[in-house]
């Protein structure tokens, strides 16, 4: 498909075309009448992409075209730089390390500032304030594993790693700021390491095929399975605050749009994001329904 949204909600959510003055504004704005929202390919960013989509459609004269399911942050970044999309959501840590190739930093405010400045100066991209939550890595185990091995922190986990089996994303295995650094800097040596896709990690830990997983703070299944999150006492993991990256020219040309998007600043905490992820991944709601419900609850869209 062309990435446009389909489904029963799309008509109902769009602004009434008879809305006075709408057509004139669209013509005046020329090719800016459409905003293309991109996302990479997992539940959380799909929900956030739907939130941005409806927020824009409900409060402006733009139509939104969706290019969801791009394969990862780098592809979204390229698409934004090349004008294929106008905005996408990503995490400050990912932007710092993977997109901008900057050295590791675990100071959340400094990371945001560095990302903001480099994105604007070198790429013409505006970085929003954090949407609120920090979706960083959190090593997690079953409560009984935590008890058996006396695990409360990352330090404990490293010490006991030779007795434990890790199930983690391939990205966690490969990214130099993740497992390779845990091994080289702290001598971590898991008994076994399995590269597993997103939800398979949880199936594996549930079935005792692995002892430890690299969860994210907002994972739906983290709370559902009642896993114990180990404290990052080493400040090992960089901050991963969700932010919107938006074409800077678009925002400069339209302060009203900038104001509307800023309504998401600080609006979503870890618990809220985790609950929205669970509504999709566990309860089977669509990302679009969940986004709509969030916007209505926050007074950012009407029923």
Residue locations for each model-derived region?
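C-terminal transmembrane helix and the adjacent membrane-cytosol boundary/short C-terminal tail
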Residues: 2-24
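Immediate post-signal peptide segment of exported/extracytoplasmic ligand-binding proteins
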Residues: 23-37, 155-165, 296-303
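Short, well-ordered beta-strand elements
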Residues: 30-44, 62-68, 162-168
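Short helix-initiation/N-cap motifs at beta->coil->alpha
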Residues: 65-78, 170, 191-203
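Ligand-binding "clamshell"
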Residues: 99-128, 209, 221-235
């Amino acid at each position: 498909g062309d990435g446009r949204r389909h489904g029963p909600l799309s008509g109902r959510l769009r602004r009434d075309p008879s809305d006075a003055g709408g057509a004139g504004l669209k013509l005046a704005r020329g090719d800016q009448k459409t905003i293309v929202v991109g996302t990479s390919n997992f539940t959380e960013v799909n929900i956030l992409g739907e939130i941005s989509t409806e927020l824009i459609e409900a409060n402006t004269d733009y139509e939104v075209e969706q290019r969801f399911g791009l394969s990862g942050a780098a592809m979204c970044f390229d698409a934004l730089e090349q004008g294929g999309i106008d905005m996408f959501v990503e995490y400050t840590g990912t932007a710092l390390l993977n997109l901008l190739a900057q050295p590791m930093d675990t100071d959340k405010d400094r990371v945001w500032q560095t990302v903001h400045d480099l994105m604007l100066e070198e790429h013409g991209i505006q970085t929003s304030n954090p949407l609120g939550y920090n979706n960083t890595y959190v090593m997690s185990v079953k409560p009984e594993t935590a008890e058996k091995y006396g695990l409360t922190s990352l330090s404990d986990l490293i010490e006991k790693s030779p007795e434990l089996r890790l199930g983690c994303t391939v990205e966690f295995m490969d990214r130099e700021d993740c497992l390779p650094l845990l091994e080289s800097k702290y001598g971590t040596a898991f008994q076994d390491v399995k590269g597993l896709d997103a939800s398979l990690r949880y199936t594996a830990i549930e079935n005792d095929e692995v002892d430890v997983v690299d969860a994210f703070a907002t994972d739906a299944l983290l709370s559902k399975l009642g896993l114990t999150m180990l404290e990052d006492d080493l400040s090992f993991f960089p901050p991963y605050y969700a932010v919107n990256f938006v074409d800077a020219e678009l925002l400069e040309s339209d302060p009203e749009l900038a104001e509307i998007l800023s309504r998401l600043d600080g609006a979503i905490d870890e618990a809220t994001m985790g609950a929205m992820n669970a509504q999709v991944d566990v309860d089977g709601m669509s990302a679009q329904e969940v986004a709509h419900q969030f916007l209505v609850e926050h007074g950012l869209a009407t029923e």
